[in-house]
């Protein structure tokens, strides 16, 4: 799984949790 990527409009960016506060994958 990747982390640190930017989320798209559906908060999808990787297989890990997407932080809506920072709009990034954690």
UniProtKB/Swiss-Prot annotation:
Query: Main localization of the protein?
Result: secreted
One Gene Ontology molecular-function label: toxin activity
Question: So which tissues is this one expressed in?
Answer: Expressed by the venom duct.
**GO CC, alphabetical:** extracellular region
Q: Transmembrane segments in this chain: where?
A: none
Q: Does the keyword Oxidoreductase apply?
A: no
Disulfide bonds listed in the record: 7-18, 13-25
Q: State the family named in the UniProt similarity comment for this chain.
A: Belongs to the conotoxin O1 superfamily.
Q: What is this protein called?
A: Conotoxin Eb6.16
